[in-house]
């Protein structure tokens, strides 16, 4: 049996912006990395977490102006094979609790 090695793809330069932070989170990821890992790493960097007080606070990633709804997909699945840079926004969604 002959094994064919997958050509090593260059890393995906990933950047996540979050307001009100002044600096973006930047890290290179393999294109097979799941979007959920990028979200988790960015949330750790910005020291934020999903939580509930009177309201429910949830964080999600936005890519190309659209909310990323499937965080189990890889960067390659999200952006395509040849794209080597990803710019996300980390957005906080606040859902009001019962008054």
Predicted features along the sequence, with ranges:
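Ubiquitin system architectures
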Residues: 1-99
